[in-house]
UniProtKB/Swiss-Prot annotation:
Annotated protein name in UniProt: UDP-N-acetylglucosamine 1-carboxyvinyltransferase
Superkingdom: Bacteria
A single GO molecular function term of this UniProt record: UDP-N-acetylglucosamine 1-carboxyvinyltransferase activity
Catalytic activity of the protein: phosphoenolpyruvate + UDP-N-acetyl-alpha-D-glucosamine = UDP-N-acetyl-3-O-(1-carboxyvinyl)-alpha-D-glucosamine + phosphate
Main location: cytoplasm
Sites of 2-(S-cysteinyl)pyruvic acid O-phosphothioketal modification: C116
Function: Cell wall formation. Adds enolpyruvyl to UDP-N-acetylglucosamine.
Pathway annotation: Cell wall biogenesis; peptidoglycan biosynthesis
Entry keywords, A to Z: Cell cycle, Cell division, Cell shape, Cell wall biogenesis/degradation, Cytoplasm, Peptidoglycan synthesis, Pyruvate, Transferase
Native source organism of the sequence: Fervidobacterium nodosum (strain ATCC 35602 / DSM 5306 / Rt17-B1)
Length: 423
């Protein structure tokens, strides 16, 4: 596994945000629902995106990816309904092709998915939802098979937790099933709205995305379309926190500020200076910032994918803070690494208690998942001396041109390959 070497740097300047990874993946999966050409713009060049494209190709789809322009074109028939383990093991979002393939051609099978190791992330919500909309689910030697059955005229799927992946999976699958599907306690993330917009451009009838109740009125057939992916709010939040944690100032461009209201609320409480524009934000670190208490919750709450990064920022705050993780309750592998850098933190159940320190100190730390790795890079940039972050391949799953973007902001950063990133 490769490593990233960083030294103390004040981040400043401008950075442009890419299309959202967490939109690109379900949108690519939804393109399975038609044989006509679907064109996506602002597609980020990421290893996870490449994996999803490989999955589409293994089904028989024709996929063209212009990496320089960020354009993907998908068309053609599905000829293979089994997804290979080598692809599925890399990424959890791969599971979201099961329903669309089975809905279109009658059945599909896939091994259990992989992805970041950040605690329990069961697929039960997906499977129970698929059953509610008429699918027969069976298990055989570690593989899940979905077979299209008879759907009721009106199906209600209640999600015990507003799972983003399950909401997207059921929305897309139900789009070409007969009758009405109602998803209760649906996830409300902006990426859900983006998926609804794509599906409706393809001829679907989906309503309510962005609320806790989504209604899908099935249609017989979908068609091709063109669609531009929304900006990546998590990438934006990562660079914003990086600028502030290193006592810098900068402008983060190509964002939708309304998608980050929970972050603005937290940062303004700490004393950060935030100036929001129509599609950009200017941020400036105060000389001293203050601790605060954060509850990590499903959208519109504070996002779990920014929890590791905000811990770095709060570790250098004046005063104490608490961060309670209510989405992935064991997502704290990065805490031990931050403590090794001098942070004063302890975990009690699903809460991190933080007492701010004046400085962090560079050392060798290990990236454990995508967002934790990004957080450790930020910690290294804010720390005294040199920091080496090992096992960093995770970061290339979710941050396009991450080394170049940090460098443009003034970071002293270098990637040492130990196995080339899969992009």
């Amino acid at each position: 596994m490769g490593s990233i070497i960083v030294e103390r740097s004040k981040l400043s300047g401008e950075v442009e945000i890419s299309g959202a990874k967490n939109s690109a993946l379900p949108l690519l999966a939804a393109a399975l629902l038609t044989e006509e050409e679907v064109t996506l713009y602002k597609v980020p060049v990421l290893s996870d995106v490449e994996t999803m494209i490989d999955i589409l190709r293994t089904t028989g789809k024709d996929v063209f990816f212009d990496k320089h322009k960020g354009i993907v074109k998908i068309s053609g028939k599905i000829s293979i309904t089994h997804i290979q383990y080598e692809l599925v093991r890399k990424m959890r979002a791969s599971f979201n092709v099961l329903g669309p393939i089975a809905a279109l051609v009658g059945e599909a099978s896939t091994p259990l998915p992989g992805g970041c190791a950040i605690g329990a992330r069961p697929v039960d919500f997906h499977l129970e939802g698929l059953k509610k909309i008429g699918f027969e689910i069976s298990f055989d030697h570690g593989e899940i098979r979905a077979k299209r059955g008879k759907k009721e005229e009106e199906s209600v799927v209640y999600l015990p937790f507003p799972s983003v992946g399950a909401t997207e999976h059921i929305m897309s699958t139900a789009a070409i099933l007969p009758g009405k599907t109602i998803i209760e306690n649906a996830a409300m993330e902006p990426e859900i709205i983006d998926l609804q917009n794509l599906l409706n451009k393809m001829g679907a009838k989906v309503y309510g995305a962005g609320t806790s109740k989504i209604i899908v009125e099935g249609v017989e057939k979908l068609h091709g379309c063109e669609h531009t992916i929304i900006p990546d709010r998590i990438e934006a939040g990562t660079y914003i926190i990086g600028i502030l944690a290193t006592k810098g100032e900068g402008i983060v461009k190509n964002i939708i500020p309304e998608h980050l209201e929970a972050l603005w609320f937290v940062l303004e409480k700490t004393g950060a200076i935030i100036k929001k524009g129509e599609n950009e934000v200017e941020v400036k670190s105060p000389d001293k910032w203050y601790g605060c208490d954060i509850n990590v919750l499903p959208y519109p709450g504070f996002p779990t994918d920014l929890q590791p990064q905000i811990l770095v920022y709060l570790s250098l705050a004046d005063g104490s803070s608490t961060v309670t993780e209510n989405v992935f309750k064991t997502r704290f592998a990065h805490v031990a690494e931050l403590v090794r850098m001098g942070a004063n933190m302890k975990i009690i159940e699903n809460t991190v208690f933080i007492n701010g320190v004046e400085k962090l100190y560079g050392t060798t730390v290990m990236g454990t998942d995508l967002r934790a790795t990004a957080a450790l890079v930020i910690a290294g940039l804010a720390a005294e001396d040199r920091t080496e972050v090992t096992s960093v391949e995770h970061i290339f799953r979710g941050y396009e041109n991450v080394i170049e973007k940090f460098s443009k902001l003034g970071a002293s950063i270098k990637y040492i390959p130990g196995g080339v990133p899969e992009i």
